[in-house]
Regions:
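C-terminal segment of N-terminal export signals and the immediately downstream linker at the start
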Residues: 1, 21-33
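N-terminal export signals
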Residues: 7-26
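Sequence-level preference for short, compositionally simple segments enriched
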Residues: 29-346
Length: 346
């Protein structure tokens, strides 16, 4: 077991639960399913009938893959104690991991520990992690290892820890022409390369993004954001009232780079980081870079507004496009989420 896996699993109440453990899911009269050590979270999801159910996961580390299908609407998945460190759902597939049936590799989205296509999903007070490590698998070149892959409109995460390295959180949409909305509040998200990425309208409020140390000689060592917003969507990724810290040396990371997927070459990535403290781990002189030179970041919708901290210092103005006061009024959680008010029922 590596040091990272020991750190992830140490100090958690309850036992280690295997994905194949026989389910012993209890359903009470309040439409609540309880999952305890020895049970499977996926078994609880499979037992859901109808909308509006709640799954309460009791303290423990549950080593399994969890998939919430689109038909399970308005589901709440929450940790029992309110402390996200007490409940950990973790697995270790990567993009390049071979499937057991020999049908190929998982791919980026398929590597996710937690997948949801359900509209109206709420996840709170737990940890979603992918503890696959590059050092343990030098033969694998597809090193993306996703902790959570989320599609479906009105998905919300509150007080959730999302832990991985490359591609930690994939904020996607249910279709190329869908503008699915996702809301993350008071979440902790760590990783190294493109660890918050995708095409959803995704709002991060009061969140903590943390870049990890990497044992590599090159810089940048990674990027926090990699949006792939559809050209027709006026709203991509918004980070507000958040903070960005780093376990690496100063200026080792970029704030973002645009992702224009081969399956959607018309994408026009959109990112706004505002009212956020950016630590010294982000390169202040050149905070953005390209994924491919054919799609330069300067042609994308990348903006900042009223950020603070050493990583936010504007030394070369053309390298840090800023919103005006009037423009900033168009980039708020309310304007991004429209008629959906996720805080009302959290």
């Amino acid at each position: 077991m590596t040091l990272r896996r020991r750190t992830l699993l140490t100090g958690l109440a309850g036992g280690l639960v295997a994905a194949g453990a026989a389910p012993a899911v209890a359903l009470d009269r309040r439409r609540v399913l309880h999952v305890r050590p020895g049970d499977s979270v996926q078994a609880a999801v499979d037992a859901v009938e109808g909308g509006g159910r709640t799954i309460v996961v009791h303290p423990g580390t549950y080593r399994e893959v969890v998939n919430v299908p689109a038909g399970v609407g308005e589901l709440t998945l929450r940790g029992a104690t309110g402390d996200p460190r007490d409940v950990v759902i973790v697995y270790d597939n990567a993009n390049g991991t071979q499937k057991p049936d020999g049908s190929g590799t998982y791919g980026t989205a398929g590597s996710a520990t937690f997948t949801s296509a359900a509209p109206g999903l709420t996840v709170r007070d737990l940890t979603l992690a992918n503890d696959w490590l590059r050092a343990d698998h030098p033969e694998i070149t597809g090193t993306q290892a996703v902790a959570a892959y989320v599609t479906g409109d009105r998905s919300r995460f509150s007080h959730v820890r999302l832990l991985a390295h490359q591609d930690t959180l994939f904020v996607d949409t249910s279709a190329l022409d869908a503008f699915d909305r996702q809301y993350f509040s008071h979440c902790y998200i760590e990783g190294d390369v493109d660890f918050v990425f995708g095409r959803a309208t995704a709002v991060f409020a009061d969140c903590h993004f943390h870049t990890l140390q990497r044992d590599v000689a090159f810089t940048p060592k990674g990027m926090v954001f990699a949006p792939s917003t559809a050209r027709a969507n006026p709203h991509g990724i918004l980070a507000v009232r958040s903070r960005i810290t780093s376990g690496a040396e100063d200026a080792a990371y970029k704030l973002a780079r645009p992702w224009v997927p081969s399956y959607e070459t018309t994408a026009w990535p959109s990112l706004v980081v505002r009212d956020t403290r950016i630590g010294p781990g982000i390169d202040p002189v050149a905070p953005y870079t390209n994924m491919r030179d054919a799609y330069p970041w300067q042609s994308m919708r990348f903006h900042e507004y009223r950020n603070t901290g050493p990583g936010s210092v504007i030394t070369v103005p053309e390298n840090r496009p800023q919103l005006t006061f009037a423009e900033a009024r168009l980039h708020t959680p309310a304007t991004y989420l429209g008629d959906w008010e996720p805080l009302r029922s959290l």
